[in-house]
């Protein structure tokens, strides 16, 4: 599949068949993520793969409890947020997918030279570029999954 074809055929899927992704295919998809551009090529991402049902259920339970707390707090103030309501649907999707790929910021890169040098930049300025790099890695992962015929959701 051409890259442009993957871009235009990629879609967000909210219902999954419980089909395992072969290890070699998953590795190819993650390798595409690693190829994303990053500031100074510091590759600030870490990937966590979750396939075990018990772990997915535990993660979903934690998320549901946090969402309930936010919902209770909002109810007390009279605020109704549709994004919180729709987040419960995301938790359902999380339980249904066979493979979860969590992408997170590796904060160890902030002292990668072990010299305790503190930049004058605000941490938010540095983190912003790293978060953009993580977004690029996620996009590569989604496009690689599309290329392999695997449905995904951001």
Walk through the language-model features, giving the residues of each.
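Specificity-determining recognition surfaces
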Residues: 1-27, 43
């Amino acid at each position: 599949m051409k890259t442009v074809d993957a871009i235009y055929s990629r879609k967000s899927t909210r219902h999954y068949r419980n089909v395992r992704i072969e290890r070699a295919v998953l590795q190819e998809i993650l390798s595409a993520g690693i190829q994303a551009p990053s500031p100074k090529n510091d590759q600030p991402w870490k990937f966590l793969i979750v396939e075990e049902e018990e772990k997915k259920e535990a993660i979903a339970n934690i998320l549901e409890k946090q969402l309930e707390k936010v919902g209770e707090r909002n109810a007390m103030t009279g605020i109704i947020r549709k994004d919180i309501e729709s987040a419960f649907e995301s938790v359902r999707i999380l339980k249904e997918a066979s493979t979860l790929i969590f992408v997170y910021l590796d904060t160890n890169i902030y002292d990668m030279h072990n010299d305790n040098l503190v930049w004058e930049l605000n941490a938010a300025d540095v983190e912003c570029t790293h978060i953009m790099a993580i977004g690029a890695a996620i996009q590569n992962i989604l496009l690689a999954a599309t290329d392999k015929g695997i449905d995904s959701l951001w």
